[in-house]
Amino acid sequence: MMGLRDQVVAGLLICLGAMLTACGGSSSSGQTTTANDTGSAETRAWQPYERPQEFSAMVTLPREFIEMRDGVRLSAHITLPADEVGNPVETPLPVILTQTGYNSSTGGVTAANPYFVQRGYAQVYVDVRGTGNSEGVWEAWGPVEQADYLEVMDWVAKQPWSDGNVGTWGPSFMAITQLLTAQHNHPAHKALFAIVPPGDVYRDITFAGGQINGAFVPAWLGLVTGLSLIPAQESFQDPEQLLSVFAEHTANAVTEFQATTLIGGLTGSDETAYDSEFWRVRSPLTHIDKVKVPTFVVGGLRDIFQRSEPMAYEGLKDNTNAKLLIGPWDHLQGSQLEGLPVDGIPHGDDIALAWFDHYLKGMNNGAEDMPAVTQYIYGEERYVTLPDWPHPQLQSERWYLRGDGSLSQQGAAADEGSEIVLQQPFAGICSDSTAQWSAGILGLLPSPCYDDNRINETLEVTYTSAPMEEDYFINGPIQADLWISTTALDAGVVVRVSDVSPDGVSRQLTSGLLTASARAVDPNQSRYVAGNMIQPWHLYTADSRQPLAMNEVVAINVEIFSTSAVIKRGHALRISVGASDFPRGIPPVLDLVDQLAGVMTVYSDADRPSSVVLPVIPIEALPPVASGE
């Protein structure tokens, strides 16, 4: 049987091929983060959790259709526990609901989880409007689809097999539907378990840095489209409905949403190429402070939603019981919480089961007291539990990009030189970004580029610290404050943060991307630590664009997504600056023309001191390795 990762990879590759042949809000980061020198917040430890199954079998009922307010019908598959001969139990049960765009009739990522069902849960998968075998037009988390979420919740809570307590579960697409549902606090919605969820659809992935993601977005649109054209077995009993849905989904893809949205982004459409209401309404961080439903967030250090996962927790924690678990995962790995159990953390299914057992079944199992924050720490190569995110003892330190290629906490001298970078549109392909921003798919192919950034660094300028004399702990967002100019009319700027081992291997920890003309920042929505801006909030609107003149020197603030790492004693910290992160970032056509054939200069003198602001935690705040690990 194919595992979840295999199902996702196969689906993406098949649908990408089909696509290529067939198709010719405000964030919670707007605040000042202050340091807490006491570090008094309690840090809890993980406890094991297992519960024996209650039922030996399960059964999936015949497909049902849920009629929406406008007559559109959504396809639903319901799986219930069963007795030894396959009869569904008659006792009403708590329900685990998943609303998906990946066709609930295909199995794989949309198959019921026996672990939950056999422990006394009904599990329901619903194809959102215009996807799978549901009728209607898909609009990817738009207002109409969001209204459907609540109607589905109403329907599920009232069914005879439901006891009215509903939890939501699932990765990626199936995680964003949870967060968008939870902002309405439906009375039946008692808990959610959001695995690798998007938070800000524009800034996270689709247009990070003002450039469209060419590694993931086209393949993802193709995946949803391709899976929407696969009929459920039951559909052959109603050929008229089958053909109607097939025609509707095809027209939707070509003329109404998928193709038009992608083309609009590439051509610079005001609605999709900029951070408009189109994106804000689809981004859970816009209204994350409204959520009162207990929420468990799972993220990945190399996930495509790396930026927003800790920010979602941050926006939730003051209004509900929220937990955060971040692993060393790309999107595919994080979708299945790969590698657990480890370091005292239970298996992913056991964590979710404990969460639902407490909030849906009322079991006094201590789930509410799980560790608030659990993070994997690069360099330590282990998970640790921490009191909060951002860490209560967070400080900021500024390191300067020196003219001699060094990285130092000492400011630049007046006569220090500058460095140049050729603006090549395909630079970055030999870096870990290619694996990360393809959701981990391209990372399955063997390449030396993913574990060592030195090949890619030949196309960038690098600034490297002296070997660390003591372990150096960073945890949080990073900001690069650069002074640049270009001989072209615009520039793409990528900044990478790497750990350089004594043998010279350069391991990329995280990165950030920005189109220079999109450099306008709203200081009121940006994050500050100890007086330093550490996470800029770029406006990304058409009106806020700041065109460059040839050879004009400008200051830009590049947002580098959060990471957690210890640069070990004897290792060095490296910042590299380049002009492209292909295929993660592809500028809209007109921006690309403005950037071609340019030479970008990075300045390092006292009047134009390029630097990075790092999120530093005292190494003493890092929990020690537990005995026996």
Where are the model-predicted features located?
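Short beta-strand/loop motif that positions the catalytic acidic residue
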Residues: V291, V297-G299
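C-terminal motif of bacterial Sec signal peptides marking the signal peptidase cleavage site
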Residues: M19-A22
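N-terminal cap/lid segment of alpha/beta-hydrolase-fold proteins
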Residues: P48-T91, T464, M468-E470
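Alpha/beta-hydrolase fold nucleophile elbow
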Residues: P160-F173
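Accessory cap/linker subdomain of secreted extracellular hydrolases
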Residues: Q118, A182-K290
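Cap/lid segment of the alpha/beta-hydrolase catalytic domain
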Residues: V85-K158, T206-A208, Q336-L340, S501-P502, ...
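C-terminal, loop-rich substrate-recognition/catalytic regions characterized by aromatic stacking residues
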Residues: P341-E629
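Active-site-adjacent alpha-helix of alpha/beta-hydrolase-fold enzymes
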Residues: R307-A322
